[in-house]
Regions:
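Nucleotide/phosphate-binding catalytic cleft detector across ATP-hydrolyzing
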Residues: 1-150, 158-227
Length: 227
């Protein structure tokens, strides 16, 4: 299987098909430290204020910030795979995309999380290279190919040629920062408090980056308590 372990979302592919596309969130029962939900179900528990349940986003700025929670999340997401994809232990071979600016310690953390989650053979690939290969770029040629990959926690900018990174930069700004800006704007401009999921919906509906817009985005009604 191939896994894009993102700050905001995690995608799992098998046989050139997207099998899992879920938020990178895990809900853990505080009494026994057991994961009770991952992905969308765990995301729906955010901001509920239940003391017996902790919702954790194990990745921050593109890297793992909570090793144990990340391991539980990976296991849970693999368990969500349909039975026809999951019946022969899908985690025998795993390819995981990592930020191009990852340190040795961060790479070790990714390896440990995936291996403890069930991977037997693990291969890591830098996110810009995975993105370039995914859209059919020829990164083996002598001409440089440039990729700008905006994720939830980081933006990856890289030029590739002859099968390797020529120059790259990983910036800790991405979709999560856009969400925080939306929350701050609603607070200052409209005296309204909104949650992170609401900010995400606003961004996706009226703020998505599109090459061409035949019509302006429709207005969106937002409801929330006063500050």
């Amino acid at each position: 299987i191939a896994m894009d372990l993102g700050t905001a979302n995690t995608i799992i592919m098998q046989d050139n098909q997207v099998i899992i596309d879920e938020p990178s969130v895990v809900a853990i029962r505080t009494a026994d430290d057991t994961a009770i939900a991952v992905g969308k179900k765990a995301s729906a528990m955010i901001d509920r204020g239940e003391e017996r349940i902790r919702t954790i986003r194990p990745l921050k700025d593109g890297v793992i910030s909570d090793y144990k929670a990340c391991e539980k999340m990976i296991r849970g997401l693999i368990d969500l795979m349909p039975k026809k994809h999951n019946m022969f232990n899908p985690a025998v071979k795993m390819v995981v995309a990592i930020p191009s600016g990852s340190t040795d310690a961060e790479i070790r953390t990714v390896k440990d999380s995936c291996l403890h989650a069930g991977a037997r053979d693990l291969y890591l690939i830098y996110e810009p290279m995975a993105a370039a290969l995914g859209i059919g770029m020829d990164i083996e040629g002598p001409e440089g190919c440039m990729v700008v990959d905006i994720g939830g926690g980081t933006t990856e900018i890289a030029v590739m040629a002859l099968g390797s990174l020529v120059v790259n930069q990983s910036i800790k700004v991405g979709g999560d920062a856009f969400n925080r800006d939306i929350i701050q704007h609603m607070d200052k401009a409209h005296n309204m408090r909104i949650s992170a999921p609401t900010a995400e919906r606003i961004k996706m509906k009226v703020g998505s980056a599109l090459p061409e817009l035949a019509e302006a985005p429709e207005d969106m009604m937002v409801v929330g308590p006063n500050r």
